[in-house]
Amino acid sequence: MAENVTCPEIKDILSENECLENFGGLGVNVYIFIKSDLAAPLEPEAGKNTYAALTAASFKKGKGLFKFECQDGGQGHTWENLGFRHGFKQTLDYVLESVNAASAYVARGLNNLKCGYIIEDGDKSIIVYDKLHDFKYDSGNIKGDTGKKPEDERTVTLSGSLSPTMYGRYE
């Protein structure tokens, strides 16, 4: 039997309703969790694109969030629709300033583990997670670069996506 789904209410979105200036970019911290470390799959609040705050009780004993300090101005979250009634694709880009054996080790884990991501956006946090679909890094989207000249920056650049999701952004 087909499930009836209610469309979200359409409302005014005005910049004067936001108590912040509309600057691009995100905070320098990216928090990562492994989906299998959750005590139970996360569920958005009924009819909304928000999750309850994660606490220690959200995770199995001894598990939790990993914090990555990233390059200032290197993080971005974009989303796009996948067509009528096909949901959205979310993309997360972030840049680590550490290029060494530890960052290569972590990059391998991120490439192969099923993870969720939390990114600071002003006084809110964007949550890139879906209990049914996995965040993926396509070929070539995790790159380490030591640079060639002394003035070059040493970075690990990561760009992955999650699709389909019901909304383009979850908080």
Predicted ranges, named:
Residues 79-101, 151-166:
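Oligomerization/assembly interface segments of phage tail-like spikes and tubes
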Residues 32, 96, 119-121, 162:
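Hydrophobic side chains in beta-strands
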Residues 105-131:
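Short, acidic/charged, Gly/Pro-enriched secondary-structure junctions
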Residues 131-171:
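Mixed-charge, glycine-accented linear interaction segment located at domain edges/termini
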Residues 3, 8, 12-93, 135-150:
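Solvent-exposed edge beta-strands and adjacent loop segments
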Residues 101-108, 169-170:
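Short, conserved charged micro-motifs
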Residues 38-39, 99-101, 124-126, 165-167:
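Generic "edge-of-domain/loop-turn" microfeature
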Residues 1-3, 170-171:
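Short acidic DE-rich linear segments
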